[in-house]
Amino acid sequence: LDAAIADAAVPPIARATALELLAPYLSAHDVPAVEQALRDPDPQVRRAALALLDAWEPPRRWQTGAPLLADPVRSVRLAAVDALADAAGTVTLPESQRATFATAVAEYRAAQMLNADRAESWLNLGALDARLGHADAAEAAYRRAIDTDPHFLPAYVNLADLYRQLGRDGDGERVLRQGLTVSQEATLQYALGLLLIREQRREEALTALGAAANAAPEVPRYAYVYALALDNAGRRADAIAVLEAAQRRATGDREILTALVSLASQSGDTAAAQRWGAALQQLQTSAAEPR
């Protein structure tokens, strides 16, 4: 993928797609390709590269991405705000950069308000304010998103996560249960399950996490977390069964394989531990090969 990203002969849309495909496998090996993509002449490539900066530490993210706050293309500037909002507070900014950032943030807000009748715009504003550390404004924006479209489920999840960060899981549970009256969708069940684990309400958590894993079997993370919760509840055989089923659907998932190795080892099943360990080693070897 790195070679395709760096090859100017490859069409821009293909290079942007290569950057999107790189996201789950991003490593230090890929840094030069991402940095080069941030300077690419085509704006869709620059936008795709900005989306990868979340994996970097905030100070480095700011240092690398800040020039794009003044990009000549508006959509790139907006993507830069999204990528850098929570990084700005981690570095001491000279006056010129503070002004550039403030201008870009104002432009981002104005762009969202053009579609203020859509819940997605309020979600975006809430996420921006949350990353800027403006908790009250973020809460109000997420509430506005829910009021605008009660069936827009990401707003419930984001608001509950904001409450988690604020130490208000009681409010978060109420929000998620409100969302579940609209839809039993997996993301709501998963978020509720994690909240209930934090609250030490394990049986309720297992019910919610199991519902998420069953509703969205294509998402390995749900099965992984559900299996860990089962194991912590003393149900190792059930946990292994959940992981094995998930592994059959997602053969290249590192977390699933790692958990299978761990649980097989703890169970004294040497043959299974070796089998899953070999699969994990093969996956790691493939990931280390140049893309």
Predicted features and spans:
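Residue-level recognition of tetratricopeptide repeat
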Residues: V73, R118, F152, E185-A186, ...
